[in-house]
């Protein structure tokens, strides 16, 4: 696939067979609409997902030779430690643990990994259990208790290696004393619907937890800690990435401010309000602890690989950024308008351009009548519909793919959506109302009817969102 002769954005015929991809329904997505452009954006987001493979990152950034474990510019002499224990939870944790066990073998003395994905094979040295996401379940509570118990057994002379990644807050959830688990579950659900960013949500979760905010590290008193993680937050702040085992930089006052900002202070339970008003909600000090954190994958690195893919396809990459945040419908509408204007009028971007972003975060603020049902969808799917709606308003030839890198957008079984400038007219023919779907946060249902949901299944990684937008020459009115 190329961007056409001399990179003009004129389209070449589509190959008969879809490119090799981790997207499971590529044929469906290429069965309608602007097939050539769709193939380009699907190839590019696939390149981004491949670049976000945590196992490959461990192979590249963690070395083990002659008893020395090297990571993050540090040497850890495993011959001098009493035990090596691996603890983790999150969407990318199993992939990290698998690669690490392959590297260290029986030098790992035990551990526990909590995941939400089906376990295809057991690890030899580390137990793997499943729990629930995005709202914690009783399995999440039990997993968190076990992580806490294992950490408490460690002390001076032990090496604790962690693999906490995005999703750990729900998969391993242990409320502080005095806060019922049901109240913590409701807190998670309220925050997910609020439109708050990951950073804001975590500022609350960390102060209503018995293990987050560095509390798990405090339980492993005296142990040396090596954190291996991937970034799913804007700015790659380590106390948001693996906040169980690093020093927390947020405050209880920030948590309370977040709840008030989104109108949730009066919605959370009295026990949570009482806890946040107490000194127990402040995170422990970890000064003097030997803690090393290695960010294996971040959005900027993924974007670089996507750029390489775009060039290989004969198009011109333009990086929008790795720290884009905003409401999904607003972002999608803006990008759809921008792409359509560029296609039809050659400004601000010329045809033959692919716009890229990875590591940012689209959010959805759920607005509904009391008691009304929530639609089926997620931020990337809502963004895709808003893009399609905006792109249809001018004589444009554009396509976009919007994917949550973990394979589950908004907790659904779809990773995102792939649309183009013919999507909105086709939706009208099929009696699918894009305006209603966006207003009712029912983007998943609409995209499913259109055959435009992207399905990957659990990817084993989590670097937030990956977006690609291809701009070809349109018909200037």
Tell where the protein language model's regions lie, with residue ranges.
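Short beta-strand segments
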Residues: 87-89, 112-115, 161-166, 226-233, ...
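Accessory alpha-helical/coil subdomains and C-terminal extensions
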Residues: 220-226, 247-334
């Amino acid at each position: 696939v190329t961007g056409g002769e001399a990179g003009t954005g004129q389209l070449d015929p589509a190959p008969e067979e879809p490119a090799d991809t981790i997207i499971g329904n590529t044929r469906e997505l290429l069965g309608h609409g602007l097939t050539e452009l769709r193939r380009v954006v699907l190839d590019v987001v696939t390149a981004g997902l491949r670049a976000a493979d945590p196992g490959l990152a461990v192979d590249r950034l963690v070395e083990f030779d002659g008893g020395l474990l090297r990571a993050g510019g540090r040497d850890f002499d495993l011959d001098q430690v009493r035990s090596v224990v691996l603890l983790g939870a999150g969407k990318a944790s199993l992939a990290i643990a698998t690669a690490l066990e392959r590297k260290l073998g029986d030098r790992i003395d035990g551990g526990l990994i909590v995941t939400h994905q089906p376990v295809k094979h057991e690890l030899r040295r580390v137990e793997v259990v499943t729990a629930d996401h995005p709202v914690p379940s009783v399995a999440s509570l039990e997993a968190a208790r076990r992580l806490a118990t294992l950490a408490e057994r460690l002390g001076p002379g032990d090496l604790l290696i962690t693999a906490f990644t995005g999703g750990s807050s729900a998969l391993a959830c242990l409320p502080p004393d005095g806060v019922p688990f049901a109240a913590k579950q409701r807190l998670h659900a309220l925050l997910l619907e609020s439109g708050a960013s990951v950073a804001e949500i975590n500022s609350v979760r960390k102060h209503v937890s018995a293990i987050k905010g560095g509390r798990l590290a405090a339980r492993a008193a005296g142990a040396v800690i090596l954190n291996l993680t991937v970034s799913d937050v804007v700015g790659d702040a380590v106390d948001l990435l693996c906040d169980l085992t690093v020093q927390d930089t947020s405050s209880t006052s920030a948590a309370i401010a977040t709840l008030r900002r989104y109108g949730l202070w009066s919605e959370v339970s009295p026990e949570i309000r009482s806890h946040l008003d107490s000194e127990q909600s402040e995170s422990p000090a970890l000064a003097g602890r030997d803690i090393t954190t290695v960010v294996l994958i971040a959005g900027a690195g993924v974007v670089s690989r996507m750029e390489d893919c775009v060039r290989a396809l004969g198009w011109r990459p333009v990086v929008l950024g790795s720290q884009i945040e905003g409401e999904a419908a607003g972002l999608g509408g803006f990008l759809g308008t921008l792409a359509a204007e560029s296609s039809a009028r050659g400004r601000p971007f010329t045809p033959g351009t692919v716009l890229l972003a990875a590591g940012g975060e689209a959010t959805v603020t759920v607005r509904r009548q009391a008691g009304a049902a929530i639609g089926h969808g997620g931020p990337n799917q809502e963004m895709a519909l808003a893009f399609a709606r905006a792109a249809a308003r001018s004589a444009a030839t554009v396509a976009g793919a919007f994917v949550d890198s973990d394979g589950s957008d908004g907790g659904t079984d779809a990773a995102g959506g792939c649309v183009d400038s013919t999507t909105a007219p086709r939706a009208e023919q099929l009696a699918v109302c894009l305006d209603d779907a966006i207003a009712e946060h029912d983007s998943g249902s609409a995209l499913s009817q259109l055959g435009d949901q992207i399905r990957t299944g659990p990817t084993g990684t989590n670097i937030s969102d990956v977006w690609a937008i291809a701009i070809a020459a349109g018909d200037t009115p």
